[in-house]
Amino acid sequence: MLPEPHRLRRHSDFSLTVRRGRRMGRRDLVVHAFDRAQADELVSSGGPRFGLVVSKAVGPAVIRHRVARRLRHICIDLVDSVPRGTDVVIRALPGAATASSRDLEKQLRAGLLRLDLLAPVSNST
């Protein structure tokens, strides 16, 4: 489970991130990111917060919950990598139902990288 300080809970936080944040689409995901320091709110501290949107278009409840669990697990690994004060909303597209966890992680990391929220990983050995 994603720790409470790293979860988006309020509808207003979701809508602010989706409407005013930057967006990057991937094959099975759309990643929205918003820097809370840009908002009129005084709350710009704290770690990154993640929110998930998995609609009925993804599939029946069992599939939607499986996709949400996979994405939540990926977000736990990204908490220390995403800058503090950033809100991230991940919207699953219908293709996410058949995507593997590895594919979802690659797509999410690629989206965050394109939004300049992750440092590129060097493959020097």
Curated annotation (Swiss-Prot):
Q: Which GO terms describe its biological process?
A: tRNA 5'-leader removal
Keyword field contains tRNA processing: yes
This enzyme catalyses:
Endonucleolytic cleavage of RNA, removing 5'-extranucleotides from tRNA precursor
Q: What is its EC number?
A: 3.1.26.5
Q: Which NCBIfam families match?
A: rnpA
Concerning its family, UniProt says: Belongs to the RnpA family.
According to UniProt, the name of this protein is Ribonuclease P protein component
Organism lineage reads as: Bacteria, Bacillati, Actinomycetota, Actinomycetes, Mycobacteriales
Gene coding for it? rnpA
